[in-house]
Amino acid sequence: MFWRLRSKDWSYANTAAVREGFHRLVDQDLDPAPGLLAYRDGRAVGWVSVAPRDDYERLTNSRVRPKIDDTPVWSIVCFVVSKAERGQGLTSKLLDAAMAYAVEHGARGLEAYPVDAGDGRVPAALGYTGLLSTFEAAGFEVVHQIDSPQSKVRRVIVRRAAALE
């Protein structure tokens, strides 16, 4: 929900309101859906949020993550992977599924906002947008360096054409 709310609206939201908003969003049975779930043995173990960039209020109004050009891109804004599944490649599988889903729904370009871990590890609380290395392995290229003094990690904007090889 973070990406679907303006900064000032997020600052006033409490956990219950965010959870309720998320449930309302999912219950709308939207097409396209607001994201994709990964299941193992009938249990949800991962999530990726993917939608047209304009669906994300925070991006529409962002000075930190500016609109690069007029290409109508789909944005991949966050991943959630259960602790038991981390380190097993699920984020890459979710990314592949998100790219395919966006293409199926007419995306011409894909955009994301990962962190660059460099040689180190990134805490899950900071790496929820994905790691640069994961996106680079999927054919994305850095198109913008995000300069944010309050960020504890290097963040970038990456893009790739939507056509999948």
Provide a role label for each language-model segment.
Residues C78-V81, G87-E104:
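Conserved acetyl-CoA-binding loop-helix of GNAT-fold acetyltransferases
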Residues L25, Y39, R43-V80, V122-L132:
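Conserved acyl-donor/pantetheine-binding loop and adjacent beta-alpha core of acyl/acetyltransferases
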Residues P34-L36, P72-W74, K152-V158:
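Short beta-strand micro-motifs in enzyme catalytic cores
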Residues F2-G35, R40:
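Active-site rim helix/loop that mediates acceptor-substrate recognition in acyltransferases
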Residues L37-Y39, S49, I157-A161:
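Short, well-ordered beta-strand micro-motif
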Residues L95, A102-L126:
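Conserved GNAT acetyl-CoA-binding A-motif
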Residues A125-A138, H144-E165:
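C-terminal "cap" of GNAT-fold acetyltransferases
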